[in-house]
Regions:
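Catalytic loop of short-chain dehydrogenase/reductase
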Residues: 2-3, 7-33, 39, 46
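C-terminal helical subdomain
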Residues: 35-40, 46-96
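The alpha/beta-hydrolase serine catalytic core
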Residues: 1-2, 86
Length: 96
C-alpha cells in the first residue's frame, strides 16, 4: 500500500471491542487490543493516503436484520473503503 500510495485496511469486531463483557473476557481483551492497534495504524498511515477503519457489529450477524444482514454489512464495509471517514463505525448502536 505504501508503494502504491493508497489503500484501505478494515477491522471488523464485535461490541466487546469497545464495551467489555464479563462473560466474554477473551474477546473483550483481544478485540480491545486489536482496536487500539487499528486506531494507531489509522493515525500513523492517514498522511500516506492509507485508510484504516473499523466496523463494530454488536451481537450476531443476522439475515433479514435491517442493520446486521450480511448484504447490509457488506455495503457498510464498502462505504468504509470509499468514504474514508473516521476510524470507527457502528453497524448499530451498542444499546440496541
Amino acid at each position: 500500500m505504501r508503494q502504491l500510495g493508497c489503500g484501505t485496511v478494515v477491522f471488523v469486531n464485535g461490541g466487546t471491542a469497545v464495551r467489555p463483557h464479563p462473560d466474554r473476557v477473551g474477546t473483550s481483551v483481544a478485540f480491545a487490543a486489536e482496536s487500539a492497534c487499528g486506531q494507531l495504524l489509522h493515525d500513523a498511515l492517514q498522511a500516506e493516503n492509507i485508510h484504516v477503519a473499523q466496523l463494530i457489529i454488536p451481537g450476531a450477524i443476522t439475515p433479514g436484520d435491517p442493520r446486521k444482514d450480511p448484504d447490509v454489512l457488506a455495503d457498510a464495509l464498502w462505504q468504509l473503503h470509499t468514504s474514508r471517514g473516521p476510524y470507527r463505525t457502528f453497524a448499530e448502536p451498542l444499546d440496541a
